[in-house]
Amino acid sequence: MNTTRTLDNSTIHLPRILCLHGGGTNARIFRAQCRGLIAGLKSEYRLVFAQAPFASQAGSDVLSVYSQWGPFRRWLRWRPEHPVIPPEDAVQEIDTWLEKAMHQDDLAGATGEWIALLGFSQGAKVSASLLYRQQSWQELFGTRPAGINFRFGILLAGQAPFISMDSDLTLDPPLPDASQITDLKHSERELFYGKGHVLRIPTLHVHGLRDKGLDHHRKLFEDFCAPQSRRLIEWDGDHRVPLKLKDVSLVIHQIRELAKETGVY
């Protein structure tokens, strides 16, 4: 299994952020796309990049620059020809690959607390869904996944709705499961809005104003995340990770503010 982690030993003691790439790309590409964030946060956080479990064709947004950087991976189905996997198996694979990325970083000598999830596009959807599962377990059972206490999420171009990451949780209405394509192009999306699936773990949302999926990203922000715990950055870009210093600086500032708010420092 391949994961990409920061190789700078000076960061091994720092709080860690687990990073989930988009669909049709991979951890190596996402690390390159996040180079501005890595540079700006290198003295404060260790960013660890997890690889998704499932093989995929390349996403159209990576072909122009990263066409030779395969193989490409995905967390969820995003095309009809992707094999249907039982949802419980899909969730188990996602959890396994995330746990292995975290364990590999432990073996590399890192000791910092896992404080946040950072995801782009499909990785942001999965990150938000994982945070919602953590919140649901805490509320229903007074516990959370073993060893996991993500304090906040950084959601870049994340799309609603959440997906169900635990078939044992009885939710009303039920969320789409991890075997489904949830691109919000179908009328059933209305079932999920305003129905109580609200994430209260703090989140930072980063939206490109020229992103074709902007309306769907705003749905995640407006309809699925609590007003008192959500933050928003809008920048002049399309479906990609901010790279210019002025845009990256805004994201870094808000990450620092979330860290203060959630007691990281």
From Swiss-Prot:
GO MF term list: hydrolase activity
Disulfide linkage: none
GO terms for cellular component: cytoplasm; nucleus
Record's keyword terms, sorted: Hydrolase
EC numbers on record: 3.1.2.-
Catalytic residues in the record: S121, D211, H239
Coiled coil location: none
Pfam families: FSH1 (PF03959)
GO annotation, biological process: antibiotic biosynthetic process; monocarboxylic acid biosynthetic process; secondary metabolite biosynthetic process
Pathway of action: Secondary metabolite biosynthesis
Annotated family: Belongs to the LovG family.
Function noted in UniProt: Esterase; part of the cla gene cluster that produces clavatol and ortho-quinone methide. The clavatol biosynthesis cluster cla and the terrestric acid cluster tra are both involved in the production of peniphenones and penilactones. The non-reducing PKS claF is responsible for the formation of clavatol from successive condensations of 3 malonyl-CoA units, presumably with a simple acetyl-CoA starter unit, and 2 methylation steps. The esterase claE probably collaborates with claF by catalyzing the hydrolysis of ACP-bound acyl intermediates to free the ACP from stalled intermediates.
Name the record gives this protein: Esterase claE
Gene: claE
